[in-house]
Amino acid sequence: MSKLSRKQQTQKRHKRLRRNLSGTESRPRLAVFRSNNHIYAQIIDDDAQNTICAASTLDKDLKASLKVNAGSCDASTAVGELVAKKALSKGIKQVIFDRGGNIYHGRVKALAEAARVAGLNF
């Protein structure tokens, strides 16, 4: 039996996690996607099937202010602060954190902690 690749392991974990995670209007889901070069965060209402707000290292205002590589922990911290600011402006304080099958470490952890410091509760 062949060993699963890291990507396959992540996808398997994400599928298992998503069985129990669902965002509502009162408590939407903060979903994180991490690629090799960038990180993306979305606040999603699964009941209405729409994205309330989103932020990533590709955002124009964030990209201009970043002095570091977009795949770094510092960039993830900036994305966490930005998504929290956008959510708070839309009246969202409580979210469910969806790490997207990634291990809670490094860039995913940096984004989550920055969002918490900026005012989101999860």
Curated annotation (Swiss-Prot):
GO biological process, alphabetically ordered: translation
Keywords: Ribonucleoprotein, Ribosomal protein, RNA-binding, rRNA-binding
UniProt xrefs under Pfam families: Ribosomal_L18p
Bias kind Basic residues: ranges: 1-19
This protein's GO CC annotations: cytosolic large ribosomal subunit
Keyword DNA-binding: no
CDD domains, per database record: Ribosomal_L18_L5e
Single annotated GO MF: structural constituent of ribosome
Record bears the keyword Cell membrane: no
Region annotation (Disordered) ranges: 1-27
Family of this protein: Belongs to the universal ribosomal protein uL18 family.
NCBIfam families linked to this entry: L18_bact
Function: This is one of the proteins that bind and probably mediate the attachment of the 5S RNA into the large ribosomal subunit, where it forms part of the central protuberance.
Assembly notes: Part of the 50S ribosomal subunit; part of the 5S rRNA/L5/L18/L25 subcomplex. Contacts the 5S and 23S rRNAs.
HAMAP family: Ribosomal_uL18_B
Protein name from the UniProt record: Large ribosomal subunit protein uL18
Organism: Prochlorococcus marinus (strain NATL2A)
Gene label: rplR
